[in-house]
Amino acid sequence: MPTTLRRAHVHRLPMRSPDDVAALEAAITQGTIDPAGIVAILGKTEGNGCVNDFTRAFAVRSLEALLGRHLATEAVRQIAMVMSGGTEGALSPHMIVFEAREVDEGHAPRAFAASLALGRARTPVLPSEHLGRMQQVAQVAAGVRAAMNDAGITDAGDVHYVQVKCPLLTMERIEAAEARGVRTAVRDTLKSMGFSRGASALGVAVALGELAMDELSDTEICTDYARYSERAATSGGVELLDHEIMVAGMSRDWTGPLAIDHGVMRDAIDIEPARAALARLGLDVPGQLPAAARGRIAAVLAKAEAAQSGKVRDVRHTMLDDSDVSSTRHARAFVGGALAGLFGFTDLFVSGGAEHQGPDGGGPVAIIVERT
């Protein structure tokens, strides 16, 4: 009998402003994208990426308004919309639309044994007093397992990228918690972003078997950076109270030419792991990728973080000493430039704030390629 499998499609679309959904609207009109198949939308918006970056919520509302014309309200809510603020340097604002379709493979032999697989999940609302603590780690771990199940991925070793959009604390949320007689992990709203990202990343590590729950405690979150996930990418935002999770990996139950692999940068200029991942995906070329090879790259997804040591390869950096510009903004620009030099384009999904996401000062890089 013919076999019905799922096939992933990835569309990288430009954005002229945080509310610009014209490219997505055109793709839907032309039939290139089926709204019913959208699993997740990741976007880089041109805000500051900090607590008061409302470009993320602006972009989400614009996407919801567009998709609401094609889908029921609950169907729109199920789409993971993860906006990452900050396009410092020459990083280009863009969105990446992840779509899944069912296809009938017929009786012909499959071109590839395994293909890109996508899954998503949402967690319950996280109480403010649980943010940055072990309760958040546990909640995210459960959410990642649910997203893996949605993707049909049973082996955590087949997962190459986990994107988590996590909440942060505002003074209003902190005061509401204190009015209930509880205290939050931190009272600094900007620091709360780091604690939320860090706890979420450790939740990914637990779900993927990189760490065990009994190895962790509240005191190690955002203090012991020797504990991390090599496949987590977490972004904080004011626009949600729960977690939106997308898992990307490889599965024999999916078909199509798309494949994903990842590497882990050991510091902000360590591009060789990304080059090695490209080689494993069939793009083993010296220097910057030539135009023909660039055309096969569906997405580049990376994390960036200023090293807590204050140094890059034993030479001092000033990213942590700048009182005017957050270190996450410096790191995005710096790592974005390093990766753009390798890939040859600037619409890279480089997200700042890599607490417990790769080694201190480094971070994971996932690459999705169309195989031939």
Curated annotation (Swiss-Prot):
Residues 258-372 are annotated as: RU C. Pathway: Xenobiotic degradation; atrazine degradation; biuret from cyanurate: step 1/1. This is Cyanuric acid amidohydrolase. It comes from Bradyrhizobium sp. (strain ORS 375). Residues 115-252 are annotated as: RU B. One of its GO terms (biological process) is atrazine catabolic process. One of its GO terms (molecular function) is cyanuric acid amidohydrolase activity. Signal peptide: none annotated. Residues 1-105 are annotated as: RU A.
